[in-house]
Amino acid sequence: MLDIKYVRENPDAVKKMLEMRLLASESKKIDELIRYDSERKAKVTESDTLKAMRNSVTQEIAKIKREKTGSADELIAEMKIVSDRISEIDAELREIETKQEELLLAVPNILHESVPEGKSAADNVVYKEVMDCKREFDFKPKDHIELGKSLGMLDFERGAKIAGAGFPLYIGKGASLERALINFMLDLHLEKHGYKEVFPPFFVNRDSLRGTGQWPKFADQVYYMNDDDIYAIPTAEVPVTNMHRDEMLQSKELPIKYAAYSACFRREAGSYGKDTKGFLRVHQFNKVEMVKFVLPETSYDELEALLGDAEDVLKALEIPYRVLLLCSGDISANAAKCYDIEVWSPAEEKFLEASSCSNFEDYQARRAQIRFRRQPKAKPEFVHTLNGSGLATSRLMVSLMENYQTPDGKIQVPKVLQKYMGCEVIG
């Protein structure tokens, strides 16, 4: 979340950010937030003044009793009234702080100056295209659904029978290819890019969702287990970022870089009418996530490095892709800047999102209270957090299967995956 001090001192900048994010109607909440902040400060001042008075008079009462110079009954009665008023003020203060925090949690992140202004995905800027490995087919390429069925790799019908639509079932070489992708990506990030592996819980509590910004605003997108008051993770970003919630780090530890595999679960509420066939939109998918905790002054260099780490996966697999710089109307509420990586689907003849790489600056760290000290006795500061998909396997599987298909309906296994698969061709 934003620093209330920043909101108080820069209300116009915050309102401009809301306008750029197509949330101009929320501007009145900034005025309300500042009003609560003024009320809070006034209540704190009043409470502190009365507490100082009570402490002083309490000492006077003790002196009167000790020296037996008179009756302290009148002062005691007055302090009873003062104490009752302090209790009232403190209760009012807690209520104000709760309302202020609710409003502050809902305010999106300030956008980096390099984020282009725009209204929708159509206004995203193509940052780069890497299409030199694009294959030209002399036959009509099949889509991943047809390939998966004909080769006995995927069974969406049985997946739907087991759990419902949007829960794919991998079989045989399909399961092997999925596992190969996960292991390859983890090995690449650990051995080449210097990340530390984490295998996190697939369920988290509300504090964890709050820390990364999915709660309360996006709670309707997450699967919730009511009896246990616990949530299925939408991404490994949530448990991995919260590893350091409420912790004080030292600058010499930074950057901290984690790579984690997890299954991801998303309700995809509001996705009706969108392309939902096959892997294009599912409720459960697999992903390797990269998470960084870095010094504030290095976070944008670290973002470019994070993007490069994700791109290395596609370069090694020789899959065509492009990188988009997301505009103000399409970027997530938590991110200050974000790149999307899209892979090429020959059958669909379009790009499919396979990764997002984001810098949150101190937005998540402030919510999760992840701080560091530059020196042992230095003032604590908030770290900057970043994360990126490295990558999500569902759309990657689509692109891989379609790009590597042969005229006779088989799939060539990319060279970097052959040692994991134990074969060169599927089919």
Swiss-Prot record:
L-serine binds at residues 235-237, 289, 389. NCBIfam families: serS (TIGR00414). Its EC number is 6.1.1.11. It catalyses: tRNA(Ser) + L-serine + ATP = L-seryl-tRNA(Ser) + AMP + diphosphate + H(+); tRNA(Sec) + L-serine + ATP = L-seryl-tRNA(Sec) + AMP + diphosphate + H(+). Pathway: Aminoacyl-tRNA biosynthesis; selenocysteinyl-tRNA(Sec) biosynthesis; L-seryl-tRNA(Sec) from L-serine and tRNA(Sec): step 1/1. GO terms for biological process: selenocysteine biosynthetic process; seryl-tRNA aminoacylation. HAMAP family: Ser_tRNA_synth_type1. Keywords: Aminoacyl-tRNA synthetase, ATP-binding, Cytoplasm, Ligase, Nucleotide-binding, Protein biosynthesis. Belongs to the class-II aminoacyl-tRNA synthetase family. Type-1 seryl-tRNA synthetase subfamily. InterPro entries: aa-tRNA-synt_IIb, aa-tRNA-synth_II, aa-tRNA-synth_II/BPL/LPL, Ser-tRNA-ligase_type_1, Ser-tRNA-synth_1_N, SerRS_1_N_sf, SerRS_core, tRNA-bd_arm. ATP binds at residues 266-268, 282, 353-356. GO terms for molecular function: ATP binding; serine-tRNA ligase activity. It holds the Pfam family Seryl_tRNA_N. PANTHER family: SERINE--TRNA LIGASE, SERYL-TRNA SYNTHETASE. One of its GO terms (cellular component) is cytoplasm. Consists of two distinct domains, a catalytic core and a N-terminal extension that is involved in tRNA binding. This is Serine--tRNA ligase. The keyword Nucleotide-binding applies. Homodimer. The tRNA molecule binds across the dimer. It is found in: Cytoplasm. Catalyzes the attachment of serine to tRNA(Ser). Is also able to aminoacylate tRNA(Sec) with serine, to form the misacylated tRNA L-seryl-tRNA(Sec), which will be further converted into selenocysteinyl-tRNA(Sec).
